[in-house]
Amino acid sequence: TLDMVPRQFVYISSLSIFGPIHEDNYAPISERDTAMPNTAYGVSKLKSEHYLQSLNDFPTVIFRPTGVYGPRERDYFLMAKSIKQHIDFAPGFKRQDLTFIYVRDLVQAVYLAIEHGVRQRAYFVSDGNVYSSRTFSDLIQKELGNPWVIHIKCPLFILKVVSLLAEFSARCLGKVSTLNADKYKIMKQRNWQCDISPLVEELGYRPEYPLD
């Protein structure tokens, strides 16, 4: 038992707990879907959710954000750096639907949950829009004022080999690689749409920072 129960406990999980899903029809991931993570990161987040949900009467509210960007975010910074150098790499040839959330909109969702005293609830969080990988890179190019960029679609098997080699090399050097087996699985995933209507309808969430 927990002797000191907080008034409310907010846990930031991840959309990654659902793994690759609805990649045939690109339907938004919803709370009706079954979480089946395919990465160590997703598994750890799901286990944390299950633990919190197993605590009787523990006042938990869970957020499952899509890709979060903002100050000091590293992964998207590396992509922007590549585009600044006139190269844009897109994983695979099949359609990929991306979603994002600016950190301030995520904070808005958290504050709304606190204000409403939400308990035993889980919400998906995004800015409500869906972007193609090309649209995403074009927006970065425009923001950087880069006059031209070479767009390269990298076959997934090549990306997988490069990811595994980068991870192995980093381990040999006692370092952590940004590009690794887990990251490959995330980049490979085709559908990142999610249903934020419960967050909008129940808490009045209104995203203020679209990617563009």
Predicted regions and their residues:
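Active-site Tyr-X1-5-Lys
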Residues: 36-61
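Glycine-rich Rossmann NAD(P)(H)-binding loop
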Residues: 91-96, 123-131, 141, 153-154, ...
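Conserved Rossmann-fold NAD(P)-dependent oxidoreductase catalytic core, especially the SDR/UDP-sugar
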Residues: 1-40, 61
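Mid/C-terminal beta-alpha module of Rossmann-like enzyme folds, strongest
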Residues: 113-178
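Substrate-positioning beta->alpha
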Residues: 43, 47, 73-78, 92-114, ...
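C-terminal amphipathic/interface module of NAD(P)-dependent oxidoreductases
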Residues: 131, 139, 175-212
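Alpha-helical membrane-targeting segments
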Residues: 78-100, 149-191
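Flexible, glycine-rich beta-alpha linker
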Residues: 18, 61-78
